[in-house]
Amino acid sequence: MNSYWLNIYKPRGISSAKLVSMVKKILGKEVKVGHAGTLDVEAEGILPLAVGEATKLIQLLIDAKKTYIFTVKFGTKTDSGDYAGTVIATKDYIPSQEEAYNVCSKFIGNVTQIPPAFSALKVNGVRAYKLAREGKEVELKPRNITIYNLKCLNFDEKNATASYYTECSKGTYIRTLAEDLALSLQSLGFVIELRRTQVGIFKEENAIRIKSPDEITKNFLEEKSIKIEAILDDILVLDATDSQAQQIKYGQKCLFNYEEDFRRLSKFAYREEFEENTERSTAAYTLVREDANTGLTYKLPLEVELSVSLLWVRYKGNLLAIGSLNKSCFNSLRVFNLL
């Protein structure tokens, strides 16, 4: 079975699950397909799909940063937080253009959000949106998110709307962000347009747009496929020997030779991820290495007990496993059947 990613652009009016079903119909019901983060039915934009063994990497994409462009209608609140909901409150005050632009700085950084009642989160095993549609009260716990960037792109005084761009962490609800923005401006608001423009490495410029499954063939999707390792480009990689690969395949812990393998790891030593996730012991001997990008020289312990929270192992050019390196030992998190 082929394993790869598809960069799909979800149109408005279709659920993420329905889109997965459409692709499965094209590829074959026996093919495993999953999506990396639900998009609301009323939203459009990037919905990465994992095919085959790529489904084992979905969590990495769910954890990735995402970018959105959304438009807020001021002066009105709906029960769902978007245009598909029922109006439940109105307010005469509409913020000015200056206020709509200046409010952004208040939301950049670590933020606490209460997810909307109309969401796919579960309450006692039941989807919150199902309870909300039945008129039942839904209480969801606040969650911590991060807004890396937020800026106003356009303000329309006549229509009382403002469009925003945001880069945010996983778990961010744009409908809640829009409502919180409006409240901060002493008004009310709901989302009238929502577009996800990027998820990790997947961008809208080269996305596949599916209108009908009859228009797209399996060969077309496979031609547009993205290699499974593409989302691992910024993560450390080790090449396994035959014996190491055998151990990993059988779920055994695998030892790596540090004098040899650390030299290979050192190619990536100056990436930010490596610096953050590495613990170094004191050693009498050091490996002196110059970073080609900065020209700076680093002295690193050669006999090092290295710990990396996430890396992947490659065998004969193919993805074998992802996992962690704890001192001298590789512990697999996922093993892939790609050989």
From Swiss-Prot:
One of its GO terms (molecular function) is tRNA pseudouridine(55) synthase activity. The gene is truB. It comes from Rickettsia felis (strain ATCC VR-1525 / URRWXCal2). Responsible for synthesis of pseudouridine from uracil-55 in the psi GC loop of transfer RNAs. Keywords: Isomerase, tRNA processing. It catalyses: uridine(55) in tRNA = pseudouridine(55) in tRNA. InterPro entries: PsdUridine_synth_cat_dom_sf, PsdUridine_synth_N, RPE1, tRNA_psdUridine_synth_TruB, TruB_C. Coiled coil: none annotated. The keyword Isomerase applies. Belongs to the pseudouridine synthase TruB family. Type 1 subfamily. Gene3D superfamilies: Pseudouridine synthase. The active site is at D40. Residues 262-307 form the RPE1 insert domain. Its EC number is 5.4.99.25. One of its GO terms (biological process) is mRNA pseudouridine synthesis. This is tRNA pseudouridine synthase B. The keyword tRNA processing applies. SUPFAM superfamilies: Pseudouridine synthase.
